Amino acid sequence: MPKTDACERMLQSIRSHKNSKLENQRLPAILLHSIDNYIDSKSLQRTASVYFSALLALIKQSNGFDYSSIYILSIVMPATPSDEKLLHIDLLYTQIVPYLQKNNDDAPTIRCALNCTQEFLLSFSNESKELYLKAVDVVMPLLVKFSVDLRPKVRKISIQVLQTLKQKYDGLLPHLYPAIFDELQRSLSEVSNMDNPSFSKGLHTLHLLECLVDINQASGSDLGIICNALSRILTSNIPTSEPIFEMSIKLILKVLSERIDALSDAVIYELCDSLIPYWYRALSVTLLLYDNFVNRNPSRGIKGIQTLLEKILDFCISPLQSSESDVEYDGATSSDILNSLKFLRNKFTMKFVNKKNWATVLSNGIKKVIKTITASSRHANYAKALPRCSVYLQLLLGAIPEDQISELLPAFSVVARAIIKNKLVETPECLDLFKIFIQKLASPTFLECLGFADNFCNIQKSHWLPEVFRDNITGETPETFFDCFLPTIEAGNSQWWELLPLYTKAGCITNNLNENTLKKLASAIYNDRSCHSHVAQAFVDLTKIENVRQLISSNSSNLIGVLGNTLATMKNDDSNAEDLVMAATSIFSVAGDQQLQIITNLCESAPLSEPSLGSTGVIKLFPALLSISPADTWKPFLPHLVKLFDIAIPSNLSQSLSVLNFGPGLAYRLLQATLSNERMISAIVPVISRLYDSMNSVGDGSQALPKYVALERLKTWKLLFKLLPNDEFHLLPSAIAEVVLFSKHHDDDLRAMAFELLVEVGNRMKNGGKINMSLIDGEEPNKTVVEANINEYISMISANLMNDSLNLKVSTIFALTRIFYEFSDYIDDDYVNAVLEEVQSSLQSNNQEIARAAVGFIKMYITSFTKSKVLFHLDTLLPLILRWIKEHNAYVKLKAKQLLDRMLRVFSLKELEAFAENETDKEWLQRIWRVRRSRGDKKVVDNKRDASDSEDLAIKNPMNKKAKVGKVDFRKHEKKLNKASMHRDKFSTGMHTSKRVQKKN
């Protein structure tokens, strides 16, 4: 919104409060009315500049301002030109600044004064840099002071002013940062030195620091000031649970994480010395400082780290050295220290410590851990110390170099076995310890530390182990799994199969995988249902490993045989069937010369003509293999595929739905797999006409097929349409007739698929091709070859209007509606006129279903074609529609009204009245026109469609499932509609009831 419009809107709002009971609303309104009267008496325009001048005169006359004057001034200043504001700069220095310096009580007036200050500063920044910097030096301390004010609204407006100025002018930082740092030091010093401090102001100061100071732009000296100020909070007696303490930790960690190298040595030394006595309050900060300190002063840094790690270890084992359940540190709880240790796991790197110094740092600590844990196994607080020691080892593991990890293994082994013995594995700290170590160690070494290497009974009892291994195994070969876990699996513990994909998914080269191992995997699939998904995924992964493919290829026939036999014992809807099919497909893809033998074995072991095969999971295997098979392998299968449609179902199985419909269902899926295989296309094209004939021969009654079979059939037609050569379009009419029937199907998905196919075929025809008319059934044998185009496509579809089938006629009108809408720019006028004449005759039909479909076509025609084309047929269309209003039931009347409403969007009332046959028709037109006018819709829309009718929308956009043909069952509402019609006829205009009926619809 422009500033002038916003100003006028706000002033109008103020004027409306003249009689308000609230003083802060009434007084500004009275003042504004007085100014308005003065401006009007002087015959001036009510502009922001005029109000600005009047208010300045009033303030000077009163030798100061009150809330009313400064409030209105803050509203008009944004719309006042900058040059006018610069002429009155004295207002800032003589009135506003002194007021802000002396008065702290009246918050509303302060907020308005701050807004005026912002407007002056913005004007200065645009016009005069010198004036701007002078003003900034004066007002910056005030803005910072009010930015930490205890009143939220004052604080908010002050921060907004500072943020706005910072964005507008980059040169503000040298003036802004010193003011913020002064306030930071002052407020934090007060907080840390007071006996009973109020933390609010200090917290607001930290918030100001976070909002306005960019750590990456601050200088090293500025960062030093920030760290020193924040360290006062960390070393004070403020409880660690206070928000000001937590925010101080957050800010100083941000500085150390992003800009620690910018801090001077003196600052680092000072911070380390001040924080080491309070390490338990700010452990993360202290450790990060010493981590960097090593690089600046190795001897002092190593000594400090060693001291700090000793203190941390003493904390971890303190429960074992005291009878108390927990040891409290001054102001810091054990959970605070543990959380700090967890935070440091990946940030404490010790990258500047060499190997010799590492040995010094680690040796005493590791020995102390081993000794204490071993000697205190019966202590009452033993379970309390183990999670702490786990976090301590995690800290060291995150910092230690890779080649030094072996130094930690003795301590890890002692702690890990103690954790397992005391059943503490599922505590978060202990579980994290295992997960972090498995990422660093090989599986055999890890299991050896846990004591599982030679004792598989322990592995069997460790139900938590899969969670430790899951998502933490990297770069290990499958042999590791077979060596570590296969023995316990063979002992009857099949749950360990879930770890197998963790070792195979990495794709590492393996040299020791042998045929015997593959047999064990295949045997597991056949005998153990619980391992299906895991072993199947392993086979998929193994086929991707280069040096394993040959081994799998040589055993592919046996492996796929086992998978096929297993699938034959599974139900078709079994959740594991897809996994086994995926494994078989992967193995088949690397089978090479054995593919033909594999297919032969499968066909012999599971005859495709066997109806009972439909209830097993093996039916999913054939399409999957067919989709990736070479053409030569499956050429002999194509004739059998065509015969597959003629399967006879035994009478004793006819009651089973899945068996009854299995034959065509599988045939369609197999045919789809064939048609989608690019290597099979050369084998398919020569028999494409045979496939069309086969599809048509089993197409009778396709409307009655179960949904899943009908969908598979339409998907097959889609692929056949795509592969049809451009010179064989004579095969289309019979197929199109079936698809047209589906365009009226009661199921939304089938109807949407049918419309999609009709449009795709239309695009093929639009791009050209040949139609041999003599080869089309029912055509004369001596007809010529014609060029394919949209007009010929319209002829193919509209030919179905001559059929005696009521269902086909209605479906054809629906299909034509969609095609005309989609290709309106490509259809010749002669074809449009011919189809429209047929549809007009349908409008006169006494069959409501046919007439309803015709209404949908007319609605599309009116809104999708040009006005001139619609006008050509208006003399016949309008009387038919008006006849509908007078002769049909409430639902049909409603549709007819909608048609007339659409016409009134395209034509004027006079244009339509010219085609009315009598005065009654004119009255109906005038009535509908008045309804439109009462709704306030006076626009004439040319060539736009209306998305209000769900049935029409489904024809135009069938993929929109929110509005589809048949979605609303008007039969359920027929009584209501008839009742509404009766009430409507009682009124001469029909306006009120018409609106109500339309709203219900």
UniProtKB/Swiss-Prot annotation:
Modified residues (Phosphoserine): 948, 950
Annotated Basic and acidic residues bias: 939-948
Example of a GO biological process term: maturation of SSU-rRNA
GO cellular component: nucleus
Region Disordered, annotated ranges: 939-1001
Superkingdom of origin: Eukaryota
Alphabetical list of InterPro entries matching this protein: ARM-like (IPR011989), ARM-type_fold (IPR016024), RRP12 (IPR052087)
Record has Phosphoprotein as a keyword: yes
Record key words, sorted: Phosphoprotein
Residue intervals passing through the bilayer: none
PANTHER family: ARM REPEAT SUPERFAMILY PROTEIN
Official protein name in the record: Uncharacterized protein C1105.01
